[in-house]
C-alpha cells in the first residue's frame, strides 16, 4: 500500500518557464531536458482492494514463466485474426493470449455487431445510468467475439481545442462531466467481462503533429503539451482519476509529448501521477506505434507495446543482465497484464481470443453473433437521448400530423453501400458529403448492422400516417412545394482521427439552409455533428423554426430522430460544449498549435490558459455564447425552487488524513461527502419529460463556476421531484502545488443550480 505522506518531492509540479534559446532554431531535444521531472523507480502493483485475488493468481502465474515468456507478454504480435492487436498464448500454462480491439463506440472491421452512439452523443445525454447500460450491452458484444480488451473509452482529448479532430470520441469538454460518464461506462463494459483500455493518457488535445514527421530529410518531433501541475490535476488528470477509480484494467498512453517527454515514456505522468498518486493497478499500453524508446520506456512505467515492438524483445532481458533495468520491473509488467486477465475472470469461460474477429471478413468464416435483441432498447434510447434541441420557435416541434413534409440535404440519406466499416476519409473535409453521419472517422469508427437514415425513417413514418413526403437530396438550391407543412434540412460536420478540423462551419451547408429557408416558412434543421458546429449564419433566420444538434447517434440515427420529431420521445439532451457566436470567441483555443519560429523542429503548445477552457473561458472573459454549455430545450417546461444547502461536519481546510493508504483513484478521503444540496423541480408544461438538473460551484480564487453535480430525472406533468446532490472533498477542493494535495479553500463558496451553465435560477452560498 502506498501512503500519501512523503510524496511532495516525488510529485513536484512542472514549471513552464524556459531558458531563452541561444540560437535561432532549436535542433536538439537536449534543450528541453528536465522540463518533465524524473520519477523513478516504477511502482509495483500492490494488488490492493478489489485486485487482491487477481494479483495473488497473477504472481503465482508469473513465477512459473521463463524470461522469454515474460517478455512476450509485453508486446503485440501478428495473429491470423482481425483483432487490432494480439498478445501471444502460453500453451503450457493454458494462457490463450489476448485480443484487443477498437473502439469505444462499438467493434469495427467485423460482422454481426452494432454501431453504438459515440462518446459525444453519450455526453449530450447527461445520463449516467444509460451510459452504464450502453457500456454493458456494448461490452457483451466484445465478449462474444472473443475480444479481451476494448480499446476505449476516451477522455483524452478533453476538448481543449475547438477544432480538435477526435473531440467526438470523448464525452464532454468538462472534466467532472466526462469523469462521471466514463466511470459508468467502464463499470458497464467490465461488468460484461471485457477489460477497458481507457485513452489517451494524457493532454492529447490535437491531431496535428501528434506524431513525429519527416519531410525532405527534416525531422519534426511530435507536439509537446506543456502543462503546469495545477492545470494537469484540475482538468486533464481529473477524468482519469475516475477511470482508475472505476477499475479500468488498462490505460493507453498517447502519441504526443508532455512537457517535452513522450507520453509513453514520461516517468512523471506514468510512474508519478498514474501509478503512485492514483494507485493504478492495471497496465499501461501504448497507442499504436507510440513507443519511442526502449528500456527508458519500461523504466518510465510502460508495460505493453502495440502492435509490436522492435525496441524491447530480447533487449529487456539484456537490460536486466547489464543492470539498466531491474528484473522486478519485468515481473511487474507481466504481473499487471496477467492480473488484469484474472480481474476480468477471463481465465474461465471466455471465448477463444479473436474467435469472432476474422482476418478477412469477406472470406468464409464462422459467424459469431455479437449483437443481441436484448440490446435494442438501450441502443435506441442511447441514440435518442444524445439529440439536443436548441431552437423551437412557436413550438414547431413536435410535428402536428403534417400532411406533407419535404426533405433536403446530403445528410438525409444512407450510404450507397455498407461494408464492415464506414469509409475512413484519408483527409478531413468539413462534411461527409456521401451519406448521413452516424460516427466520426478513424479507429473510433464502428461496423453497423444496418443504418437507419433519416430519409428512410421518415418515409416509414409517412407510410404509417398516410401522408406525403418529397425529397431532393442533391440540389443546393432546391424547389419547395408551397403546400409542404415542414421542410427538413439535413447537414453534417465531419471529423476524423489523424486530422484536426479545418473549421467549425461549412459555407455550402449554410447556403443550403438559407436557400431552403428563403422558400419555406417552417424550416427545421438537423445537424449530425462530430464536434462543435457554429450556426450564426442562419440561426436567427425567421423561417428557421427549429434546430437539433443530432451529434453521432450510431445505426439507429433515423429511428431516434423520428421519435423526437413526432413527439413520441421528448428531447432531453444538453450540450457537452459551448457553441460560440463567432469562431474568434474561442481565441487561442480555436486552432491546433503548429511548428513555428525557434520551435519549428519541436512544436510547443503551452497550456497557458490554465483551467480556463470552454465555458470557464467564456465566463471569465464575459463572452456571450450562442448556446452555452449544458443548454438544451424540451417540449415541456421545468420550474426550480427550494434550494437547500446542508454542510456535513468534516469541512476542515486542513489536509485530509495523510496516513490514508492510496486506493484505486487516490486518497479515499477525496470522496468523503462535504456538502449536500437539494432542489425541487416541477414539470409545469404539457407533457412528461426528463430534466438534467445541473449544479455549479464557485470555489474561492477559482473559475466563476464549475460543474460539480448533475442528475437526470423524469418528471410527469404537474409533478414535483426533489433532486439531491452529494459533493465530495475533491469536488470542493483545488490542487495545491506546494502541499501536493487537494485542499478546501477558506472563504465563501457560491452554489448555483439550474438548467444550464448560464440558466441558474437558484443560488446560495456556504462558508468554510
From Swiss-Prot:
SUPFAM superfamilies membership: (Trans)glycosidases (SSF51445), Beta-D-glucan exohydrolase, C-terminal domain (SSF52279)
Keyword rRNA-binding: no
GO MF entry, a single one: beta-glucosidase activity
Localization per Swiss-Prot or TrEMBL: Secreted
UniProt-annotated catalytic positions: 287
Biological or metabolic pathway of the protein: Glycan metabolism; cellulose degradation
Reaction(s) this enzyme catalyzes, per UniProt: Hydrolysis of terminal, non-reducing beta-D-glucosyl residues with release of beta-D-glucose
GO aspect biological process, one term: cellulose catabolic process
InterPro entries associated with the record: Cellulose_deg_GH3, Fn3-like, Glyco_hydro_3_C, Glyco_hydro_3_C_sf, Glyco_hydro_3_N, Glyco_hydro_3_N_sf, Glycoside_hydrolase_SF, Ig-like_fold
Position of the signal peptide: 1-19
Glycosylation (residues): 25, 72, 259, 315, 322, 394, 434, 472, 543, 651
Enzyme class: hydrolase
Key words of the record: Carbohydrate metabolism, Cellulose degradation, Glycoprotein, Glycosidase, Hydrolase, Polysaccharide degradation, Secreted, Signal
GO cellular component terms listed in the entry, alphabetical order: extracellular region
EC number: 3.2.1.21
Role played: Beta-glucosidases are one of a number of cellulolytic enzymes involved in the degradation of cellulosic biomass. Catalyzes the last step releasing glucose from the inhibitory cellobiose.
Family, per entry: Belongs to the glycosyl hydrolase 3 family.
Protein name (database record): Probable beta-glucosidase M
Native source organism of the sequence: Aspergillus oryzae (strain ATCC 42149 / RIB 40) (Yellow koji mold)
Amino acid at each position: 500500500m502506498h501512503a500519501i505522506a512523503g510524496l511532495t518531492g516525488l510529485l513536484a509540479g512542472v514549471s513552464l518557464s524556459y531558458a531563452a534559446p541561444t540560437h535561432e532554431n532549436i535542433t536538439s531535444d537536449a534543450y528541453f531536458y528536465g522540463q518533465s521531472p524524473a520519477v523513478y523507480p516504477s511502482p509495483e502493483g500492490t494488488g490492493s482492494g478489489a485486485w487482491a485475488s487477481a494479483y495473488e493468481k497473477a504472481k503465482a502465474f508469473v513465477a512459473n514463466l521463463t524470461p522469454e515468456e515474460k517478455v512476450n507478454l509485453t508486446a503485440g504480435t501478428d495473429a491470423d485474426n482481425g483483432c487490432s492487436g494480439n498478445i501471444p498464448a502460453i500453451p503450457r500454462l493454458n494462457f490463450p493470449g489476448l485480443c484487443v480491439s477498437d473502439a469505444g463506440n462499438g467493434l469495427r472491421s467485423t460482422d454481426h455487431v452494432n454501431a453504438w452512439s459515440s462518446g459525444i452523443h453519450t455526453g449530450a445525454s447527461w445520463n449516467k445510468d444509460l451510459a452504464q447500460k450502453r457500456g454493458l450491452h456494448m461490452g457483451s458484444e466484445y465478449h462474444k467475439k472473443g475480444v479481451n480488451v476494448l480499446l476505449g473509452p476516451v477522455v483524452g482529448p478533453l476538448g481543449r481545442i475547438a477544432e480538435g479532430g477526435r473531440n467526438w470520441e470523448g464525452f464532454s469538454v468538462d472534466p467532472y462531466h466526462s469523469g462521471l460518464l466514463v466511470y459508468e461506462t467502464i463499470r458497464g463494459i467490465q461488468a460484461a467481462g471485457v477489460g477497458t483500455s481507457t485513452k489517451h493518457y494524457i493532454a492529447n488535445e490535437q491531431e496535428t503533429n501528434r506524431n513525429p514527421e519527416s519531410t525532405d530529410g527534416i525531422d519534426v518531433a511530435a507536439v509537446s503539451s506543456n502543462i503546469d501541475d495545477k492545470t494537469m490535476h484540475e482538468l486533464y488528470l481529473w477524468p482519469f482519476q475516475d477511470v482508475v477509480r472505476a477499475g479500468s484494467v488498462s490505460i493507453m498512453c498517447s502519441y504526443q509529448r508532455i512537457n517535452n517527454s513522450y507520453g509513453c515514456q514520461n516517468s512523471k505522468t506514468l510512474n508519478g501521477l498514474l501509478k503512485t498518486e492514483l494507485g493504478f493497478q492495471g497496465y499501461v499500453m501504448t497507442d499504436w506505434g507510440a513507443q519511442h524508446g526502449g528500456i527508458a520506456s519500461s523504466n518510465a512505467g510502460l508495460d505493453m507495446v502495440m502492435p509490436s515492438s522492435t525496441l524491447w524483445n530480447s533487449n529487456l532481458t539484456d537490460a536486466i543482465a547489464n543492470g539498466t533495468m531491474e528484473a522486478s520491473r519485468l515481473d511487474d509488467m507481466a504481473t499487471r497484464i496477467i492480473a488484469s486477465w484474472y480481474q476480468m475472470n477471463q481465465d474461465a469461460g471466455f471465448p477463444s481470443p479473436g474467435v469472432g474477429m476474422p482476418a478477412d471478413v469477406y472470406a468464409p468464416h464462422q459467424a459469431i453473433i455479437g449483437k443481441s435483441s436484448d440490446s435494442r432498447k438501450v441502443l435506441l434510447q442511447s441514440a435518442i437521448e444524445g439529440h439536443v434541441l436548441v431552437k423551437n420557435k412557436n413550438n414547431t416541434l413536435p410535428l402536428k400530423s403534417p400532411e406533407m413534409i419535404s426533405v433536403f440535404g446530403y445528410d438525409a440519406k444512407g450510404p450507397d453501400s455498407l461494408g464492415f466499416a464506414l469509409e475512413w476519409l484519408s483527409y478531413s473535409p468539413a462534411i461527409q458529403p456521401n451519406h448521413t453521419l452516424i460516427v466520426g472517422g478513424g479507429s473510433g469508427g464502428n461496423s453497423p448492422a444496418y443504418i437507419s437514415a433519416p430519409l428512410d425513417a421518415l418515409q416509414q413514418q409517412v407510410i404509417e400516417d398516410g401522408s406525403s413526403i418529397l425529397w431532393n437530396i442533391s440540389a443546393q438550391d432546391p424547389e419547395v412545394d408551397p403546400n409542404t407543412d415542414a421542410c427538413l434540412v439535413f447537414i453534417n460536420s465531419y471529423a476524423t482521427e489523424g486530422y484536426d478540423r479545418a473549421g467549425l462551419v461549412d459555407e455550402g451547408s449554410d447556403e443550403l439552409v438559407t436557400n431552403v429557408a428563403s422558400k419555406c416558412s417552417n424550416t427545421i434543421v438537423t445537424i449530425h455533428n462530430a464536434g462543435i458546429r457554429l450556426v450564426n449564419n442562419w440561426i436567427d433566420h425567421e423561417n428557421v423554426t427549429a434546430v437539433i444538434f443530432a451529434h453521432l447517434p450510431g445505426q439507429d440515427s433515423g429511428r431516434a430522430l423520428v421519435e423526437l420529431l413526432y413527439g413520441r420521445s421528448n428531447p432531453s439532451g444538453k450540450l457537452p460544449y459551448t457553441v460560440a457566436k463567432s469562431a474568434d470567441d474561442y481565441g487561442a483555443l480555436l486552432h491546433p498549435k503548429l511548428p513555428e519560429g525557434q520551435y519549428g523542429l519541436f512544436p510547443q503548445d503551452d497550456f497557458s490558459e490554465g483551467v480556463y477552457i470552454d465555458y470557464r473561458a467564456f465566463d471569465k472573459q464575459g463572452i456571450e455564447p450562442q448556446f452555452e454549455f449544458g443548454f438544451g430545450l424540451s417540449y415541456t417546461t421545468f420550474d426550480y425552487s427550494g434550494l437547500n444547502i446542508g454542510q456535513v461536519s468534516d469541512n476542515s481546510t486542513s489536509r485530509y488524513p495523510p496516513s490514508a493508504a492510496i486506493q484505486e483513484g487516490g486518497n479515499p478521503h477525496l470522496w468523503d461527502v462535504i456538502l449536500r444540496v437539494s432542489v425541487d423541480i416541477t414539470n409545469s408544461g404539457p407533457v412528461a419529460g426528463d430534466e438534467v438538473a445541473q449544479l455549479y460551484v464557485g470555489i474561492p480564487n477559482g473559475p466563476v463556476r464549475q460543474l460539480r453535480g448533475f442528475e437526470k430525472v423524469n418528471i410527469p406533468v404537474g409533478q414535483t421531484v426533489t433532486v439531491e446532490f452529494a459533493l465530495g472533498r475533491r469536488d470542493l477542493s483545488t490542487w495545491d502545488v506546494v502541499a501536493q494535495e487537494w485542499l478546501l479553500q477558506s472563504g465563501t463558496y457560491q452554489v448555483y443550480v439550474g438548467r444550464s451553465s448560464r440558466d441558474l435560477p437558484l443560488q446560495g452560498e456556504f462558508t468554510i
